[in-house]
Amino acid sequence: MPRSRAKVPAHARHKKIIKQAKGFRGRRKNTFSNAAAAVWKAGEYAYVGRKVKKRSFRSLWIQRINAAVRIHDENLNYSTFINGLTKAGIEVDRKVMADLAVREPEAFGALVAQAKAALA
């Protein structure tokens, strides 16, 4: 009986990797070994990027909240505002607060007033 070789499955695997490397530059897009390494590394970068995205969005929300708090009250900053909200028993996450600050400044102003009242 002749030796069985994995030509069809191997070709399919190679095609899959080459397809994933579409859009890469140079030999990375059409040479299997280079494409395989590039696809692997791209996956690593994507994994890390998904974690970094969460951090950077939280940072953006905090910056927006801080700017909006300072617009409503010059003597108040982000940390004292959050402290005031905690003392007032208001639980609103940063994503929602940042959205309020951008889209509905009046509603955010009410939050600032409540936080300031809780601090006094």
Curated annotation (Swiss-Prot):
GO terms for biological process: ribosomal large subunit assembly; translation. The keyword RNA-binding applies. Keywords: Ribonucleoprotein, Ribosomal protein, RNA-binding, rRNA-binding. Pfam families: Ribosomal_L20 (PF00453). Binds directly to 23S ribosomal RNA and is necessary for the in vitro assembly process of the 50S ribosomal subunit. It is not involved in the protein synthesizing functions of that subunit. Gene3D superfamilies: 6.10.160.10, Ribosomal protein L20 (1.10.1900.20). Belongs to the bacterial ribosomal protein bL20 family. One of its GO terms (molecular function) is structural constituent of ribosome. InterPro entries: Ribosomal_bL20, RIBOSOMAL_L20_CS, Ribosomal_protein_bL20_C. CDD domains: Ribosomal_L20. This is Large ribosomal subunit protein bL20. One of its GO terms (cellular component) is ribonucleoprotein complex.
